A protein has these predicted regions:
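Cyclophilin-like peptidyl-prolyl cis-trans isomerases
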Residues: 2-8, 15-182
Length: 182
């Protein structure tokens, strides 16, 4: 219990030296989302995300799967670029290796950012999702990489997908630019 409280406190704190992401969103949602990354909880995943952001790999990537009351997923740097074949969005990854799971005691609550993966727990790569609401069934099953500290109003405005799959049709919202912050 104490460990869980310490991890949650670390995620909620905003120390000046913490690594984060600044995501400029464009589409139905317009604005900036700021995320504090949890280097102490998932160091390997945070390293990969920040490297991809620094390379510009996330720039122009759409929110391809957005489920009302659950989460908004993005980060397919292979097939999820605006202007690409959106039927393939969500099936790609980066050229970097997949990551071993870094599960923790951190709960998937509103604003928590987690890594997307296939059925294999060690298959996370570049895709991530932001929670609209708590999802305790994900706890201990997916890697938590951070928490939104500013811009949940922007997250809430992201264009929703259709039905249970959450596949976004038409013109999806996108991450116009993603930069690493200190």
């Amino acid at each position: 219990m104490l460990h869980k409280l310490l991890v949650m406190a670390a995620l909620m704190a905003s120390p000046a030296a913490a690594t984060g992401l600044k995501i400029e969103v464009e589409g139905e949602a317009n604005g900036v989302i700021e995320i504090d990354l949890a280097e102490d909880v998932a160091p390997g995943h945070v390293e990969q995300i920040t490297a991809l952001a620094e390379e510009g790999a996330y720039d122009g990537v759409v929110f391809h799967r957005v489920i009302e009351g659950f989460m908004a997923q993005t980060g397919d740097v292979q097939f999820g670029k605006m202007g690409g074949d959106m039927r393939r969005a969500g099936t790609g990854k980066s050229e970097r290796p997949n990551l071993s799971a870094e599960f923790s005691d951190v709960s998937f609550e509103r604003g928590v950012v987690g890594m997307a993966r296939s059925a294999d727990p060690d298959s996370a790569n570049s895709q991530f999702f932001i929670m609209f609401a708590p999802a305790p069934h994900l706890d201990g099953q997916y890697t938590v990489v951070g928490r939104v500290t500013s811009g949940m109003d922007v997250v809430d405005a992201i264009k929703r997908g259709d039905g249970r799959s959450g596949a976004v049709t038409g013109q999806p919202d996108m991450m116009k630019s993603v930069t690493v912050t200190d």
